[in-house]
């Protein structure tokens, strides 16, 4: 009869300590993933627009 409460207490203590397999798999995938895997690709139009907005005033000032 004493075994049942001891078993329940051990079960309650052990269950929060067990890692969530889905969470650990996602974390390991994110650690190994590169920018290409995470769809973090640079958009050439953004860089072209930024460079144009930065360089155009410099070129215009140099010309005139």
UniProtKB/Swiss-Prot annotation:
Subcellular location, principal: secreted
Entry's localization field: Secreted
Signal peptide positions on this chain: 1-19
UniProt keyword Secreted present: yes
Keyword DNA-binding set for record: no
UniProt propeptide residues: 20-43
Coiled-coil segments: none
Cysteine pairings via disulfide bonds: none
Tissue: Expressed by the venom duct.
GO terms assigned for molecular function: toxin activity
Residues found modified as Lysine amide: 63
GO cellular component: extracellular region
Keywords: Amidation, Cleavage on pair of basic residues, Neurotoxin, Secreted, Signal, Toxin
Annotated family: Belongs to the conotoxin T superfamily.
Extra remark beyond the main annotation: The mature peptide does not contain cysteine residue.
Protein name: Conotoxin VnMLCL-05
Protein's organism: Conus ventricosus (Mediterranean cone)
